[in-house]
A protein has these predicted regions:
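Extracytoplasmic
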Residues: 18-52
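Central cavity-lining transmembrane alpha-helices of secondary-active solute carriers
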Residues: 60-77
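C-terminal ends and interior cores of transmembrane alpha-helices
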Residues: 93-131
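Intracellular juxtamembrane helix-capping segments at the cytosolic ends
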Residues: 152-165
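Glycine-rich segments within core transmembrane alpha-helices of 12-TM secondary carriers
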Residues: 171-189
């Protein structure tokens, strides 16, 4: 009786740890991008006319859809339905789209355009308010989309680690995964 022995990539320690480094790096850079405009608050107030309320609304928008629309629950359902690889691609796409909108909103290309004019008088209800600069509204919309991608990526990375490290060094891998967001907190601004 001949048995075929299948060796999976996750059976190789080098591949498992490479996967962990890639997953943790993705989360590290995602969390870095969450705080990227924090040091620029004063500049945004001067150049774009953002008041502290507009900046606070923008900064809080990252979690808005995850908390008030329960997107994180939907992200978990999506993860269970389409798997780790496809959910990772979807969360990455959401982060790229959200990051682009956020960048566009604070760039000179947004100022004076049709979208700028449209947003000045549109959507003056929760979470936005009347008089909020349109660049802050667009940045907040982009940040909401980015936040959906980040939180979806967070649960996807956790499930990916479970998949790659099942029966092996899972506790160590999870600890190292959580080291990447903590290291962001240690970054000097």
């Amino acid at each position: 009786m001949t048995e075929k022995i299948y060796k999976l990539l996750k059976d190789s320690p080098a591949m498992r740890w490479t996967a962990l480094v890639l997953l943790a790096s993705a989360m590290f850079f995602a969390y870095m991008f969450v705080d990227i405009l924090s040091p620029l608050q004063a500049m945004l107030q001067e150049t774009k006319g953002w008041d502290p309320a507009a900046y606070g609304t923008y900064q809080g928008s990252e979690t808005f859809l995850n908390v008030f629309v329960f997107f994180l629950i939907f992200a978990g359902i999506i993860l269970d339905k389409i798997g780790v690889r496809n959910t990772a691609l979807l969360s990455g796409a959401l982060m790229v789209i959200g990051a682009y909108l956020k960048y566009w909103a604070v760039s000179d290309g947004f100022t004076g355009g049709a979208t700028d004019e449209y947003l000045k008088n549109f959507w003056n209800f929760f979470p936005f308010y009347e008089g909020m600069p349109s660049s802050a509204k667009m940045a907040a919309l982009g940040f909401m989309i980015f936040g959906c991608g980040v939180e979806m990526a967070g649960i996807t990375v956790s499930k990916g680690i479970v998949k790659w490290f099942k029966g092996k060094e899972m506790a160590l891998a999870m600890g190292l995964k959580w080291l990447s967001p903590v290291s962001v907190l240690q970054q000097p601004y």
